[in-house]
Curated annotation (Swiss-Prot):
Any Pfam family hit: Galanin
Distribution of this protein across tissues and organs: Hypothalamus and pituitary gland.
Positions of the propeptide segment: 86-115
A GO MF label: hormone activity
Transmembrane domains' residue ranges: none
Compartment(s): Secreted
Family assignment from sequence similarity: Belongs to the galanin family.
GO annotation terms (biological process): antimicrobial humoral immune response mediated by antimicrobial peptide; behavioral response to starvation; defense response to Gram-negative bacterium; neuropeptide signaling pathway; regulation of appetite
Alphabetized UniProt keyword annotations: Antibiotic, Antimicrobial, Cleavage on pair of basic residues, Hormone, Neuropeptide, Secreted, Signal
Name of the encoding gene: GALP
Organism, scientific name: Macaca nemestrina
Name by which UniProt lists this protein: Galanin-like peptide
GO cellular component, one term: extracellular region
Signal peptide residue numbers: 1-23
């Protein structure tokens, strides 16, 4: 059984339109996704503005960079603001015990003002 003429023409057309790696335009320059030596996928290079009047753009760029790092599970470039619980945990001593015991031993504001 011989293939039909329209089918042969369609195959010839599709094969002629297919791009080979040699004929595809290559992206020159920086800014694409790449793999580092450990095999991790790295995002595009982020060029931060250096002028003083572009602080807002710089902060936005740093927020985007933090978002990329958060997606990849990497630490943030800006330290996060500590919550009250983190501050209390930082000052809790091991001999005091847990935070519930710590909060019971702290005098209340009204008691201090009365004395």
């Amino acid at each position: 059984m011989a293939p039909s003429v329209p089918l042969v023409l369609l195959l010839v057309l599709l094969l002629s339109l297919a791009e080979t790696p040699a004929s595809a335009p290559a992206h020159q320059g920086r800014g694409g996704w790449t793999l580092n030596s450990a095999g991790y996928l790295l995002g595009p290079v982020l060029h931060l503005p250096q002028m003083g009047d572009q602080d807002r753009k710089r902060e936005t760029a740093l927020e985007i960079l933090d978002l990329w790092k958060a997606i990849d599970g990497l630490p943030y470039s800006h330290p996060l603001q500590p919550s009250k619980r983190n501050v209390m945990e930082a000052f809790a001593k091991p001999e005091i015990g847990d935070l519930d015991v710590l909060s019971k031993k702290i005098p209340k504001e009204e008691d201090v003002l009365k004395s």
